[in-house]
Amino acid sequence: MTEFGAYSGTWKTSYCVPMFLLPILNAEDEEGKKHEKILIIANEQNKEVFMTIMGLAYISFVLNRHRNEFSYETKNRYVSRKHINENMLTDEEKETLIDVKEYIKEDLKNRVQFIFMPSFDPKEIEMYLLKYSRMGYKNVFIDTMKAETKGEYHLMSNLSQMLDRVSKENNLRILATVQLALHTYGRKYLDHTCIAEAKSIVEVAEVSLYFREVEISEIRSLSVQKFDYSQNKYIDVQSKIEDPKYNEKYMLLFIGKNRHGKDKKIILYRSNFDKVWFTEIGEVSGLSYDGGK
C-alpha cells in the first residue's frame, strides 16, 4: 500500500490523478492495448468532480502529447477548472472538452469503477474490494483517510489493517490519501509524525509520501539539483527556477518511506491545479527537520 499524506484542501486528489492513476490507466501491453482497471472509493469528491479532474489530467498529459487521437492538430490546449465551475468556458475550451470526453468514454470503458462513501466503513470497503478484485480491478484508490476525533483514530487504524490484509491476500495495489493532523500544520518537513495514529498506517505502508506547497522565498534558501543524463551527474538548477506564473504553485513531495527504492528524498514540482498539470524541477536538500521523533 502507498500512503499519500497532505493537509486538508491542498489538492491531494488533483495531484494523485495525474501522478499515479493516469500512468496506470495508460499502461499498454506488448500489443499496445490497455487492460489495467481502477476501483475508486471516495468520501469527499463525488463522481462528477472526480471525472472533471480526470478529464483535465487527460487534456494535460494525453491530448497534448498524442494529438493524432483527437480532431485537431493544435498543441498545448488546456481547460480551466475555474471556467468549468463558473460556467465561463471559451469556445476553444468547449471544443477541447468535447474531444476529451469522447476519448475518455472509449479509453476508460469498463476500466474505472467509482464508489462514493461519505463515511468510510472498513467492512463495506472490504466487500467492494473483494467484489471488484474478482472482476480484475487490482488497482484501488482510497480518498481520503482522516482522523480528527478519538473514534476516528480507531476507525483509521482498523481501516489500515484491513487494507493491508486484503491487498496481500488478493494481490491488490492500493493508494490511499491521508489527511495530516491539523496540529502539525505549519511544519516545513513532513513525515509520519504529521499523521494522527501514524503507527497503524506507516507500519503497513510500502511507500509513504507527503506533500505541501512551498513559497518561492523558501525555495531560494534551499539547494535544488537535477540529474543531467548528458553529463551523467547532478547539476544545480536553482538559478533556473522562475517565480510562479498565474495559477501556478511550487510543491514539495517528501518520500518518507520506500521499501522499493531510495527514501528520505524531497522532490520539487511546479504545478497548476486549475489545469491539473505539473512538472518535476529537481531534488531538494538543505531543509532542516522541524518535527517530532
Model regions and ranges:
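C-terminal regions of RecA-like/P-loop NTPase motor modules
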Residues: E31-K34, S60, N64-Y78, H83, ...
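Glycine-rich nucleotide-phosphate-binding loops and adjacent flexible coil segments
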Residues: M1-I142, A147-T177, H183-Y185
